[in-house]
Amino acid sequence: MNIIEQIDQEQMATLTGGKTIPDFAPGDTLQVNVKVVEGTRERLQAYEGVCIARAGGGINENFTVRKISYGEGVERVFPLYSPLVDSIKVVRKGRVRRAKLYYLRGLRGKAARITEKKQDKTRSQETGAA
């Protein structure tokens, strides 16, 4: 590991602090809680949508979330290690065959749906038995 990678690792460790970043991929529906500053107040705003891309690497990694708000498509790019991103929650896992889902921009309504990834039987049996 060279010096730059080592510095990146140290910075990622300090920026994550106590929060955990879940394992997610394009196609997953995410709920991102973002810190919003309004005047002197600071509050959390939830942004829920489909992850359509992940880009970059290391400390520069970011992801794009797309949602439909009042009939208009809205995309927002979040840096993964930003202090403004409070938490990321995976709402559901999607089954896709592409790393970049930019084709969703041209689809409307039911055509833009992503099928949910099915869990394997051993995992569902464990949760059912508990």
UniProtKB/Swiss-Prot annotation:
HAMAP family: Ribosomal_bL19 (MF_00402). Pfam families: Ribosomal_L19 (PF01245). It comes from Parvibaculum lavamentivorans (strain DS-1 / DSM 13023 / NCIMB 13966). This is Large ribosomal subunit protein bL19. Belongs to the bacterial ribosomal protein bL19 family. Disulfide bonds: none annotated. Keywords: Ribonucleoprotein, Ribosomal protein. GO terms for biological process: translation. InterPro entries: Ribosomal_bL19, Ribosomal_bL19_CS, Ribosomal_bL19_sf, Translation_prot_SH3-like_sf. Coiled coil: none annotated. GO terms for molecular function: structural constituent of ribosome. GO terms for cellular component: cytosolic large ribosomal subunit. Gene3D superfamilies: 2.30.30.790. This protein is located at the 30S-50S ribosomal subunit interface and may play a role in the structure and function of the aminoacyl-tRNA binding site.
